[in-house]
Structures are given as C-alpha cells and as structure tokens.
C-alpha cells in the first residue's frame, strides 16, 4: 500500500480486508463506490464506466438505484458487502465513520425482488464433525431451518439432497471441500469454506442454546453427545455474520425423517425431470410444469416439495387423495376456492420480512387481503363440510385480531402509513400539513376582525418566514400584541406569538408526522410479529388447500383417476399415459396409452424393440405415475393400483463426465452399481440400454448378469429396456418379455408405440438410420454386412470382413431389396424363435395342428 494513500482509502482497504470474498459497495455521499479489483470486476459485470483516480481503478452506482445492480451481482453468484457511512467524524482530519451493515449473498436474500416466488432459496451447510455427518438447509425468506442426519453411509444421500435442495450457497469445512470436491461436483455452487476447527461441538451447543434461549438441545430432538446439530450452528452463525444488526427469525430446527419419504437419488431426479428439464434447466417440460396450476406462491413451493418428497405412509397418502377426490366431486367448490386463492399473497415470506424488520406498508395490506381470502375459504369449506382444519379456537381469535389491527391502523392511501382516526396526534399533524393555508387564512380573518384593518395581509419570505403587513394609513390601529419586525417606506411588518407558533407548527408538522407515523407503524409491526406463528399457519393452510384444489382441477381437466395404494408388490396401470408428453403433445398428436402389469409373481419386464418406438417414454411414464400416486395426486390412467414403493431408481441415458475423467460407460456403471447396492424388493427399478458403451459381448454379459441379479437377489419391480435381444431367452418364473409393437406397410415401418407381451428380435437399426438421413451408400453397405453377420455368426472378425466384401450398386432396386431384407429378418427370427420352443415330446396332436397353422400363417405375412 502506498504511504501517501488518503485516510478514506486506508479506511476502505481496512474494511475490504475483512470481506475479501465480497464486492464492497463503499458509501461515499450518494454513491456506492467500488475500487481496485472490485471496480474491475464490477464494471465488467454491471456494464459500468471504469475510471481512475490517482491510479486507483474505480466505478460506482447511485444509492437510490443500487438494488438493481445488487440483484445482477446476486444472480451472478457474487456476494455484496454494503458499507454505509455515519454522520460522525471522530477525527477532524479523518474520514466519516463507516461500517459494513449487511453482506448480501445468494443464500441469504429476503428481498422479494431477488427471489422466484415458486422456488425456495436455500442456504445449505454440511457438517463432517468426526463421524457425525449432517445436512442443514434454510430458506431465510420463509425462516424454516431443517436438518437431515446421516447415519452410516452418507454420500448417496448427500448427492440426493444437494440435487433436491439445489442450494444457492453451501457452507462446508475446508477439509470436506477438498476431499469431496469431485465426488459431489461442489464447484457447481457458491461454496463458503470454513476452517475445520470452526466445527466445534462446545461452541455449537452454546451458540444454539443462546439463539433459541433453551437449556438443552434435547428440545429439538438432539443428543448433545451426538453433534449432528453442528451444521445448523454453521447456518445460524453464517447468517448472523452476514446480516449484522438484522433480527434473525429462526425459531426452531426441524429434523427430517428419511423413513417418511420415498428415496429418489440425484440421478433419478435428473432423469425423470421432476422439477427442471435437462436441456436448459428450467421448469418447462418437467413434471412440475404439468402439475403446477397453483394460484399462490406458497402452493407452488409446496407442490415442488411434494414432488421431491413422495410419501410412504398409505394413511397420509389417502388423506390427501380424499381431499382431492372431495374437491374433484364438488366442482363448484373447487372453482370458487381457486378464485379466492388467486387473492392470496405470499404471507409466508412477508411475515419473515416483518420478523427481520425489513417491511413496507404494502406487506400489511397484503396480509389483510390474504386474511379476507382466508375467511372466505373457511366459510366455503364449512358450507361443504370439508374436513381439513389446523387451527384451534385461540388461533381464530388471533387471526381476527390481526385483521382488525391492520384494517383499523394501516392506510390505503398512497402517501399515508397510518389510517385516519387511529391516532389523534397523527390526525392533527396531517390536518395541519394538508390544510396549512387554511389555518393561516383563518388566523388572518381573526386578526382583521379584531384590529378592523381591512387591508391586513399575511405574507411569507423565505428568510423572514410568515409576517403581517400593515400600510401607513392603519399604523394607528395596530394591536398591542403585534411585534414590529421590519419598517419599509410604505409598510410595516409585524409578527405575533400566535403567528410564530403557527408557523413553527406548520414547519414541524411534516417532519413530526413522518416520524410519528413511522413510530406507530413500527409498533403495529411488532404487534403483528407476535402472531407470526398463527400467520404461518394461515400460510400453511392456504398452501395445502391450493395444492389439493390444484390436483382436483388437473384431475378433472386431464381425466386423471384416483390411484389405489396397497402394501402389495404390484403396479397395475390400465391405459396409462406419460403426463408430460401428453401435456405438451395436446393439439398435435393423440398420446398412445399403454398398460403395465407387475405383481409379486411377475415383477421383471424386459422391453425390446426399435429406437423411436417409445420404450423410454413407457419406462418414464410408469415411474412418474407411481410417483404421482405417492404425492397424493390423481394419475393419468384408466385404473391404477400401486404398491408402496420405497425407492425409485431411474437409469436412462448417460453422458461422459469430463470434469471427473469418467467415460460414458463408467458413468453408466457407477449409476448401475448404486442401484444394485441400494435397491430393495419394495423398490421400482427403471433401466434403459445398460451395457451399450462397451463391446457387444461385454455389454451383453454385463446386462444379462444384472438382470439375473435383480431377479434372484433384489427381486424389485423392474422395467429393463434393451437392444440385447438375446436377453429375451432368459428363463425365470418372474420374467416377462414385452416389446414395442410395429406395423409393416411395404418397405416402411409404422411405430405404433403400443406395448405387447412378446419379445422383439430385431431393433430395425438400419431402417432408423435410413430415415435419419444416413447416406444411401452407407445404408446399402450396412445391409450387406448384416446379411453376412446373420448367416456367419461364428466367423472371426478378419474372416467376416473378407467374406463380406462386395461392390455396392447404386441402383434403387438393390436398395429396396436390401431394406426389405432387414424387415424380413425380424419375421424369420420370430419364426425361428417359435419353432425352437416346441417340445415335440410333450405336445398333443391338436396342439401340433394349431402350431403348424400358426407357422403357415406367419410365412404368408
């Protein structure tokens, strides 16, 4: 640092040194200035003009427009430290006092302009104290702090939860970060690394006890000698350090129980595109986008939570389904509810802002409007005897009290905080401010009548203020209480004690009014905050009614049916549809319905058939329908019986992971290993084209072994799509062959997208390649090679390429003949498969005649 640096710049550098990971907004007058590296980065990110003063790079933004610039930086995953200046200058030669009053970062924002109304904004902390691993999360805008305890193996659960909560920021120890950086891909996030010694059990206990004002952490379900709670301490400590003097509105810690919810690992969440698609990572084309027709921000966030946390308890699921069915059967009730709910505001986030003393008048008006809607919802539900209520008698009284307070106290007028009639002093000051000229005129009339000076006037000059003006002809009539203040050629100017007092009152009225209004406004806010618990109950109630009425609306609109949940090992779906594909195909093409039948005896389905025939859609739709049933939604099918499913594993498609040095095949094997290690007989396994990333023989061997392992060891309900047609020969009592139906019309194939119970012995890959636009020369050569492969299966590679060499003719006749060969090949393979299964030692003459008739029929097709 230069010795001749100014005192203010020394002050800046001292403050910046304490906030190295943030862009420092340094208040200078009416601007926030950035210097040095912050100026270089800020000018680039915010599009600001970069200047220099004494070779110091600098740029700045006006304080009154700073919010927009801060928002841009937050969206770019930057932290912003707000440094304000005080009015005190302790050293006459030094700068004004300055201090950082708040550090705004992506994980701790509460300003509604920085948030998406339908997405929670999570800050996460991961604790690795000794062998006690835990995952705490909070959306500060709703003030809900939760914790997940990991007992035993934790890495797969941690991957699941990082994907589920999609945090804006993560807090971890330095040692944990570098140990698991690649395994958890932590570089995707804004990560705050703390020294490992900061994870101190005793400090955490004291800090949490002090914050929650409790004698023991057992109040939250913790054992103090099992320090899982350290992750919650990390979150609270981080928020307090960032928000400085703001009140922290965290009043409890919720311990999540894994046993209550279906396990969906990170890969499954991604492959099923539950809340975001895999293309641009937005909600469009996700299950959430199809199921979200909620009317409130709270309902939208609750729907996301339901989708990512399907229930396992049949009673809890049926309770939701009962409410959905009731609303589905009472269409008028459902319509009226949704109309009322459209007037509900995000009071869950509003009350959190009130608790942190970051509020505006509109927040109180939104609470009032929401409570009006709440009363209407309650009255409507009572009329229809709808049996959902989470409030007690005291709650209802408190809710009415909150409404009355806001209705009586908060003004609807744009330039007023407090309503007329609530406070007499505010009324007086407002009257004085708004009618100052009338008060002056009234006093002038009084003095005119008293003095009989008809030409008496009251004038105002900025320097002298208000004064009476009397002309020469009336000097003799000037009352004794007039105090002469100035004599001019033709007039004299006077003041009175009353006029001085009136002027002072008028001048002070606006300032006093603003001050008193703010004081009363803050008192009202404190009164409302006392009832934050019951307001959060109202938010919870509105969110739930919103979600179940939304489910009922979608069920009626999309012809969904109520699923039956059982404790049996079964999935029986009649004429099921893929909810997302169907939704986005509307008006373009009718969706082909397919059925699924899996039970305790036949629980493994192998699905074969060509690409483009709909295998992946069939797999995904089965998983999505099962999941929808577990969240209490009606489902897209004519009939649905779903056995409780503890886990869904979905391995569909794969890509390489360059950052980890993992090939596509290795990624596929990692995902498969996770399934085989963690699936149970109550799980649903969805696997597509396992083994395709290596040699044919290796892939076939691996796929076959996986199928056998699932059949014999795991015994989970499974849908396994493959192009290894050899797998269809597996002989097992629980094994079922399914294929995608196709129809041949001349040399063309029609993909019917229907599932039938039989194997497909050909993938029609060359046909698909042709319609994809592969050059005809390549297609014809592929047909020649295919013929050789089919007729000489046992040749070694070198022999094969020698024998398969031939001149490729460009004529169309040859092309059609070659294409026809691939189509005929499937018929031949089906016929061969049928004949090979005939047991001539155990067949009656009648059965033999029927088989011969079937063979003759197939040869004519």
UniProtKB/Swiss-Prot annotation:
SUPFAM superfamilies: DNA repair protein MutS, domain I, DNA repair protein MutS, domain II, DNA repair protein MutS, domain III, P-loop containing nucleoside triphosphate hydrolases. Signal peptide: none annotated. This is DNA mismatch repair protein MutS. GO terms for molecular function: ATP binding; ATP-dependent DNA damage sensor activity; damaged DNA binding; mismatched DNA binding. GO terms for biological process: mismatch repair. InterPro entries: DNA_mismatch_repair_MutS, DNA_mismatch_repair_MutS-lik_N, DNA_mismatch_repair_MutS/MSH, DNA_mismatch_repair_MutS_C, DNA_mismatch_repair_MutS_clamp, DNA_mismatch_repair_MutS_core, DNA_mismatch_repair_MutS_N, DNA_mismatch_repair_MutS_sf. GO terms for cellular component: cytosol.
